[in-house]
Amino acid sequence: MEDVVVKQGFLYLQQQQTFGKKWRRFGAALYGGSGCALARLELQEGSEKSRRGEAPRRVIRLNDCLRVSEASGEASSPRDTSTFFLETTERLYLLAAPTAERGDWIQAICLLAFPGRRKELSGLEGKGGRPRMEENELYSSTTAGTPQKEFAVTVRPTEVSERCRLRGSYTLRVGESALELWGGPESGTQLYEWPYRFLRRFGRDKVTFSFEAGRRCVSGEGNFEFETRQGNEIFLALEEAISAQKNAAPPGPQTQPVPVPAVLPRPESPYARPHDSLPPPSPTVPVPTPRQQRGLEGEYAVPFDAVARSLGKSLRGVLAVPPQLPADPLYDSIEDHPPPRPDHIYDEPEGMAALALYDSPQEPRGEAWRRQATADRDSSGLKHGYIVGQDFAASGWPQGTEYDNVVLKKGPK
């Protein structure tokens, strides 16, 4: 497959010799990239020798190009020519082209060396103006330690590279958010990209750069290996891009914490509630505990006897013993009755009465047989006797009493 020639003509190259600098004329041919070759600028000395293939050939790879700019300050250029700089990672070239063709050469070289600026340069070409080339500060050689962004690599056969049908040389570009692989039959065609967040790991040595892609990548998961002597530069550029992406990531929206209620709300009951029932208290509003309403305090001090009376009532309720019914006695009490209490002529003042914890006991009234016996006496006052063994029957005497041998005597009072 023949390489596509983008532009062809002649250029002057300034070379350093023993006794100073000298311009030499070369036949120049600008080739675009393909699946088997990279974009390059080839310089051959002498037109007749180049036809026979005997002339030495100098190749400048455009994937190593850092900047292309005009060099208007160079006054020692050949007649009817204008100079421009072509800087690569290896050296700085000072070239001279016919004044009318210098802009075309610069634009053609930039289109192949910097595919990302193809739209910008095409717009300038459509307007008919010459592109104004300025020094690229990002790739400037004056900035020490600045890693490159595009690198020429050759794919090593692996399982995943065979599945993706990748063979030969390509351009590996370190983008802002993904690692990109450019190449193919048409120059400037992006084949694959691997976002940084989907790369599991990456590494390098003196002649190899490799990385492991995750299963969320377009190519699928697997290890990719590339032959290159710029493995360390690719590694540094990739580290810098990942760090920049982390720092530039916008912070996510701050979520306000949702307050969790102390008590979950009660679900609405599917059944009707009686109209006279009170609604349940709100779980969030504390229900005040009802307190016992105190009586209205008087404007004056409470008398001490009233305090004693209330205290006595409270003690009476605590110490009171439930009243027990008196049992029927076998013998009636014949003792004298307790003297009656004196009747008071005047009522006692309120609050001065003695506190009575217990009521006065009442005498039992089981005296029916005594009253009956008193009614059976005769007027003479004689005593009746009861003879043992003799059936005694008297009118009015209760029959079947428990004690039959009791003799009543009337004693002196």
Curated annotation (Swiss-Prot):
Domain IRS-type PTB, residue spans: 147-252
GO terms for cellular component: cytoplasm; plasma membrane
One of the GO BP terms on file: Ras protein signal transduction
Keywords: Phosphoprotein
Disordered, as annotated region: 247-292, 362-383
Domain PH: 4-114
CDD domains: PTB_DOK1_DOK2_DOK3 (cd01203)
Stored Gene3D superfamilies: Pleckstrin-homology domain (PH domain)/Phosphotyrosine-binding domain (PTB)
Stretches with biased composition (Pro residues): 250-268, 277-289
Post-translational modification: On immunoreceptor stimulation, phosphorylated on C-terminal tyrosine residues. Phosphorylation on Tyr-346 is required for binding to the SH2 domain of NCK. Phosphorylation on both Tyr-271 and Tyr-300 is required for interaction with RASGAP. Phosphorylated on tyrosine residues by TEK/TIE2.
Ranges of biased composition (kind: Basic and acidic residues): 362-381
Single GO MF annotation: transmembrane receptor protein tyrosine kinase adaptor activity
Sites of Phosphotyrosine modification: Y271, Y300, Y346
Record function comment: DOK proteins are enzymatically inert adaptor or scaffolding proteins. They provide a docking platform for the assembly of multimolecular signaling complexes. DOK2 may modulate the cellular proliferation induced by IL-4, as well as IL-2 and IL-3. May be involved in modulating Bcr-Abl signaling. Attenuates EGF-stimulated MAP kinase activation.
Family membership noted in the UniProt record: Belongs to the DOK family. Type A subfamily.
Self-association and partners: Interacts with phosphorylated RASGAP and EGFR. Interacts with RET and NCK. Interacts (via PH domain) with TEK/TIE2 (tyrosine phosphorylated).
Domain notes: PTB domain mediates receptor interaction.
Name of protein: Docking protein 2
Organism lineage: Eukaryota, Metazoa, Chordata, Craniata, Vertebrata
